[in-house]
């Protein structure tokens, strides 16, 4: 079944909607999109799971809050990029970092002490999810 799904066939409905293979040209398009003047195009690059590290690092410093917010939402964003975003001036960006499942523990510690009550509440909420999982597994 796993091979059938990977080829876009089989009984799994998701198999019909698989993305095309990641190619050098797709990576080049993501790089180009990350440099576009339109922030909506850069947001799309920030949401990509396949962007190269240098793209993620550049987008973490993007002047547009929406671009940085999209990057903070990306579960594939590298830990160092999420650490950078955990210090962002935007409460919205920090809030999305707080609920990203890939954020490293040291960044979560920083966010736990954040000046924003919203960010602090999101950190507590995420911790409660982990506590609930521990109860289920016990």
Regions found by a protein language model. Give the residues of each.
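Alpha-helical scaffold segments
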Residues: 1-138
């Amino acid at each position: 079944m796993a091979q059938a799904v990977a080829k876009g066939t089989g009984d799994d409905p998701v198999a019909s909607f698989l993305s095309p293979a990641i190619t050098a040209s797709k990576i080049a398009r993501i790089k180009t999109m990350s440099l576009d003047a339109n922030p909506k195009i850069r947001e799309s690059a920030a949401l990509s799971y396949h962007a190269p590290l240098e793209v993620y690092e550049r987008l973490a410093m993007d002047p547009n809050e929406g671009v940085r917010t999209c990057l903070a939402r990306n579960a594939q964003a590298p830990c160092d990029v999420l650490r950078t975003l955990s210090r962002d001036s935007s409460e919205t960006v920090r809030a999305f970092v707080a609920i990203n499942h890939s954020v490293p523990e040291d960044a979560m510690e920083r966010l736990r002490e954040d000046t924003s009550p919203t960010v602090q509440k999101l950190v507590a909420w995420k911790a409660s999810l982990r506590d609930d999982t521990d109860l289920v597994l016990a």
